[in-house]
Amino acid sequence: VDIAILLHDHYDVKIDFEKDSAVLSADPRIVKEELEYIQCLSYNEAKLAGMFGMKILDPIAIKEIDDNNLDIPIVITEMVKPDGNVTMIKKNPPVLEHANPIKIVTGKRNCAMVRMESTASSHLVASLQLDRQYHDFVKLSPYVIDDTEMTRLLFLDADYVRRHERYIRAYYPQTEIVYGRGVVTLIGDEMWRVPKIASTASSTVSEHDLNILNLDAQEETSRILIVVEDKGTSVADAVRAIHSTRTKIHGLK
């Protein structure tokens, strides 16, 4: 990626990664049925997929292209069938008319939830991103308790939180940290067009006797997060459950 950025001004550059498979709608190690090859992804979708458990590309690689305000096509080629399935990743890919707006359903285990006062959380976030160059977390919707606005930060690596608990608590002594969390994520820039998508996804998880601890759906983020307890096969079960209704949800459009 770094070489492509350097050569971009002088050449028509394209990055081609050869992998075992082009991008699928879920991890084939978890989901065995109704998997779909994804023809196009935006930088945003690919970055989210990498953050939340899909091994497509390192999100930092896409961030570097974005930070340089470039649009370099990235192609994921299936190694065993180079003339077969490919996935094109671009800043603004074409919107395919009949494509499922839920492009990817993915899961991530070993997460941690950090709750603290919102002003303190903004200082922590700034320090993590600017001083430590750490971005492996997401800020969820705030809530108010006893006239105080609180913020939840979902860290996607609980081990990082364990190692830096003291640093995190320094910003707010009453910080609450909860381990043993997993997250299932629906990803797609066009999901906002589908009515009742969040409620349908959450009811699907509930029907499989999985307890939803938190749900965060924001139109601007191209993602729906469903936080569950990371216990046994709960995360994988939730991914399979939601992916199995992906076609049904598409039909709501």
Enumerate the predicted regions with their spans.
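C-terminal catalytic "cap/lid" subdomain
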Residues: V1-K253
